[in-house]
């Protein structure tokens, strides 16, 4: 089982490798990836350094080019694939069908991974990508139960990657319109949900308010942990009551499911957080490296250590964690 860690910059990439990541995933410094935030991601020069460092340590580098090409910008997405391939990427994480075809025809020797943004949630969808683009892996969305994940692993020949820890998206990724509705800009094309330029914080007599494109998302009292204003994690008035109507600010943590994921032959567990600090990457990678090694050695008796859970809890949104859809009954 591969431990795949995020990096939004070179220090985070080095922290991931030095703390046990088998592979690191990154994005380029433009809107071809779904974490397009100011100050984040890699220029061509930094990408060269990243490839060199990762390969010196005999690890792998995956590059996310997982937004959807604009009608007048297809050549930019092609150039992103070209640069990633020519500089030595081990895998390309793609969602756009045209980009999958381009990469398969131009660079058949480089692994193609179907991004979570493609939202492949069933056997036929996965096999479609395998049949047409010979993909080496599919990243499953965070809306599937553990039973559904196991079932897919049994029936498809394509290795599967699952999100194991980090920010929790409760929507069918690549198909959510909340951010687009409020800001007029789609995460599928500009590369960011709740883009930072639409975010505003304001201290008021009622508390600290977070707004997205001037729409109130949440209000925090003194001592409350303030989360980034994503619409699905806001507090709203519903039938006269104010609460988290869709999802509370919380992070996914599947550490206790590790034996089941290993038994299902899941190829890779993915840590979310390219927008997070090197310190976050370092601590989370270290915990997951220890846990994977312990589980491999004795899966029958594996129990997450309390110290691991405390560390992950302290790194989590709202300092709380959940199994998310893996154990939700509504499925």
Swiss-Prot record:
Binding-site residues, [4Fe-4S] cluster: 169, 176, 193, 232
Cofactors (names): [4Fe-4S] cluster
KW Transcription (keyword) present: no
Resulting phenotype, residue 232 to A: Decreases iron-sulfur binding
Lineage: superkingdom: Bacteria
GO biological process, one term: ubiquinone biosynthetic process
Effect of residue 169 to A: Decreases iron-sulfur binding
Coiled coil: none
GO molecular function per UniProt: 4 iron, 4 sulfur cluster binding; metal ion binding
InterPro entries noted in UniProt: Peptidase_U32, RNA/ubiquinone_mod_enzymes, ThiamineP_synth_sf, UbiU
Pathway(s) per entry: Cofactor biosynthesis; ubiquinone biosynthesis
Deletion phenotype: Deletion mutant is unable to synthesize ubiquinone under strict anaerobic conditions. Mutant shows normal levels of ubiquinone after aerobic growth.
Alphabetic keyword roster: 4Fe-4S, Iron, Iron-sulfur, Metal-binding, Ubiquinone biosynthesis
Similarity comment text for this entry: Belongs to the peptidase U32 family. UbiU subfamily.
Protein's job: Required for O(2)-independent ubiquinone (coenzyme Q) biosynthesis. Together with UbiV, is essential for the C6-hydroxylation reaction in the oxygen-independent ubiquinone biosynthesis pathway.
Subunit record text: Forms a heterodimer with UbiV.
Name the UniProt record assigns to this protein: Ubiquinone biosynthesis protein UbiU
